[in-house]
Amino acid sequence: NAMGHAVRSNYLYAGVADVYAETGEEQLMKNLTSIWSDIVNRKMYVTGACGALYDGTSPDGTFYEPDSIQKVHQSYGRPYQLPNSTAHNETCANIGNMLFNWRMLEITGDAKYAEIVETALYNSVLSGISLDGLKYFYTNPLRISADLPYTLRWPKVRTEYISCFCCPPNTLRTVCQAQNYAYTLADKAVYCNLYGSNTLQTELEGLGKIALAQHTDYPWEGSVRLVVESLPRASRKTAFSIYFRMPEWCDKATLTVNGQAVAGNWKRNEYAHVNRIWKEGDIVEWVMDMPVRLLEAHPLAEEIRNQVVVKRGPIVYCLESMDIDGGKRIDDVQIPTNIKFTPRKMQIAGSDVMVLEGIASLNEAESWEGMLYREVNPTQKPVHIRLIPYYAWGNRGKSEMTVWMPVKR
């Protein structure tokens, strides 16, 4: 199981994956697979973040063995222990999650690992740096409330200098190296793991140098256009494959070469591919449906039970209090299961983002001052809300924020 300091743990798992790649020791892979399953299925946030606890104890369960219990710090918690306001989720731990999954992808070629790389990169890694690149988060909580009656260990506003200054350079390094995660190569094959406008110049063993150009507005749109720009003379008689990852969030995709449809029964977390003798100027179009989805959590995740998160493509969305009409509180907003969101481009801090606008329900209640419980207020009214990408929160001044919102069924 995944346990202990989340940054050190994730870097350790990445290192063990490197050892397995060199030695092929099967017990290492067995352990890594078990740890990965524990993280992804029981301990990872929807943003790809890791390390729920700032301080805690381990092991922590129903048994009582005081001599075996130790204090843990900035660590993984119990299975399904995923608090929002107190979530630690150090940026370095989220980067470590990327590094671990990247190595598992290189070893196995399984698209499910690329899915985690993308989820963490677009959400809990990019959230660690402001849109202007000048301010940082050490921790990445999923909720900010103005009413907490206690002080959190780390400030929940972006700052230019962090006393524990590991996350800022680590984030910048990761962003600068993101191109290295876009493609992987195999025998006469190119795998597209991450999508974004770019040019790939590489060499395929037994074939020679090739150049591919990718054109797309991803992650805002699901259409990817790949152009074969240059090929070696030897390739005129040799076929090779181009693979496109079908993400977990995509139910339907189409693949065409020079306008001709390519048949295939592709599934989530798999690769679609075309194998052929290519020509310079060939155009491949890979179009993924990108619906707005409402996600719910496992019922054992008590802090987020009966709540939903909004996701479109790889982007997790959040609600800031400034984006609720009438200046209402995030606590009062509920998301109907039949809500219709409209994607719209806007700028935040000079950066283009895709926001989602829709009509939610508002349960406008009186102040909770001096109360812990009270009778349910059944009165609700519609309210216009705007959701922004989670990575972009905290760039417009201080506000409340939440990723998970109560669901109205």
What are these regions (language model features)?
Residues 105-114, 247, 274:
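Carbohydrate-binding surfaces of carbohydrate-active enzymes
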Residues 1-11, 49-89, 133-162:
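Carbohydrate-binding/catalytic loop surfaces
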Residues 237-258:
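Beta-strand-rich binding/interaction modules
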Residues 11-26, 81-85, 96-109, 227-232:
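Well-ordered alpha-helical scaffold segments within catalytic/enzyme domains
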Residues 1, 31-48, 119-130:
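Long, well-ordered core segments of solenoidal/helical folds
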Residues 254-283, 292-298:
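A surface-exposed beta-strand-loop module
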